[in-house]
């Protein structure tokens, strides 16, 4: 679906899910399409960014874990297309449960920052 020009529809869905009353503080929304058993497309609408981001390892790993547990992917070498590129995900299972995830793909440093302790709320530094 994402590859068929439905980006605006997905963005509206992402906004709706991100602000759903079930999540009082908001939530990230992961929208996906299955291209084949082990080839997925995912878009993550992130809280705070209020738009799609290039990639989300947590969302990507969660998607593969869920689809593997449901038997919809093999869990081995699953290709997941993010806006920022492709990740390969392996979901290890132990006794029928996902026990580990391995995400492999490129990583690029896009910014760097420093927050001094004085800028943090007092309870954060204890």
State where each predicted segment sits:
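Short glycine- and Lys/Arg-enriched binding-loop motifs that mark or flank ligand-binding interfaces
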Residues: 1, 22, 51-55, 80-81, ...
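Single conserved hydrophobic/aromatic residue that forms the stacking wall/gate
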Residues: 1-10
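Conserved strand-loop elements at the edges of beta-sheets that form or border functional pockets
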Residues: 3, 34, 82
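Gly/Ser/Thr-rich beta-alpha loop segments that engage phosphate groups in nucleotides
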Residues: 7, 59-61, 107
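Conserved phosphate-donor
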Residues: 14-45, 50, 86-90
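Residue-level signal for inorganic ion chemistry
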Residues: 32, 57, 103
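Glycine/serine-rich anion-binding loops at beta->alpha junctions
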Residues: 45-68
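Conserved glycine-rich phosphate/nucleotide-binding loop
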Residues: 65-126
């Amino acid at each position: 679906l994402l590859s068929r020009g439905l980006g605006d529809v997905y963005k509206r869905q992402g906004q709706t899910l991100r602000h759903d009353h079930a999540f009082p503080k908001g939530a990230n929304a992961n929208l996906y399409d299955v291209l084949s058993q082990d080839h997925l497309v995912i878009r993550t609408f992130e809280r705070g960014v209020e738009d799609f981001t290039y990639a989300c390892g947590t969302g990507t790993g969660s998607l593969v874990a869920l689809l593997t547990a449901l038997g919809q992917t093999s869990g081995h070498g699953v290709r997941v297309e993010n806006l920022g590129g492709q990740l390969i995900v392996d979901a290890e299972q132990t006794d029928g449960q996902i026990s580990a995830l391995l995400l492999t793909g490129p990583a690029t440093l896009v910014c760097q920052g420093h927050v001094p302790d004085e800028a943090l709320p007092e309870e954060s530094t204890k």
